[in-house]
């Protein structure tokens, strides 16, 4: 009976840790990493690369909630296990260190190699530095820009000596779109809590404009690579809806466009980066 109860507690803790890691975005980034790695590596090696990315994303997600703990408690964020008291701080801190150590080992000694591994760790470091510092400054887009440019680049560098510029620019611009769209849903609570990054300083309207413009820029880049011209009018329509629809619909609309662009980015990357195994 005691063993069964202990197993249940351990399972509950694992599930709460996954919830605290911002599991949706973490899994999405991991999936994109795997899809980009498949043309360059055999499936088993691609899985190791995906695991390196997954452990890095866990670190970023957990440090985000650790840094925001007091603010989340003030706002009574019951959907966050740390803020609600369902998960102990020490447990998350310990899990973060374990995940970070695993990420370093998998990045440097796995298929990514030293060059690709260091670039990947640069991206992870940018994500963590955003949580601890940049989130509250007007330079808040910078870590996103660097991290999202590094993300596809590290996978390419594991097999090639250089990275296509279109992939670097598309990743960087998507990082800007991801940052501004991610902040939109919490714009007012962030301001009330004194979190004044670039989106909070510029305001909702300009943040929407930057997000929409970024998605259009990505669509133009992807169209030049994939020859799929439908992306550009779709991006313009999405940008129009950003301003016409109520604010509560803005984030789902942006994420829908982001998913479309990421899907095409993966397809374009696979087609142009394919190498014999």
Which residues does each predicted region cover?
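Multi-pass alpha-helical membrane architecture of UbiA-family
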Residues: 2-277
């Amino acid at each position: 009976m005691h063993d069964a109860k202990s197993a249940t507690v351990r399972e509950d803790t694992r599930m709460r840790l996954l919830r605290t890691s911002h599991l949706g975005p973490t899994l999405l980034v991991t999936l994109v990493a795997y899809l980009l790695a498949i043309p360059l590596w055999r499936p088993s090696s691609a899985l190791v690369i995906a695991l390196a990315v997954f452990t890095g994303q866990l670190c970023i997600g957990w440090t985000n909630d650790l840094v925001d703990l007091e603010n989340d408690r003030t706002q009574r964020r019951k959907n966050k296990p740390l803020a609600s008291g369902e998960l102990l701080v020490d447990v998350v801190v310990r899990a973060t260190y374990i995940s970070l150590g695993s990420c370093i080992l998998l990045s440097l000694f796995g298929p990514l190699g030293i060059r690709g591994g260091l670039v990947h760790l640069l991206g992870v470091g940018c994500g963590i530095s955003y949580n601890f510092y940049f989130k509250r400054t007007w330079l808040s887009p910078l870590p996103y820009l660097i991290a999202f440019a590094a993300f596809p680049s590290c996978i390419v560098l594991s097999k090639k000596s250089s990275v296509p510029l279109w992939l670097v620019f598309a990743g960087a611009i998507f990082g800007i779109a991801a940052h501004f769209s991610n902040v939109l849903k919490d714009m007012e609570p962030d301001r009330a809590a004194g979190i004044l990054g670039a989106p909070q300083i510029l305001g909702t309207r300009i943040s929407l404009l930057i997000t929409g413009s970024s998605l259009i820029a990505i669509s133009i880049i992807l169209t030049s690579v994939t020859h799929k011209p439908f992306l550009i009018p779709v991006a313009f329509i999405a940008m129009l809806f950003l301003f016409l629809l109520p604010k509560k619909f803005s984030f789902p609309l942006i994420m829908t466009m982001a998913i479309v662009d990421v899907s095409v980015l993966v397809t374009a990357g696979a087609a142009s980066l394919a190498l014999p195994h």
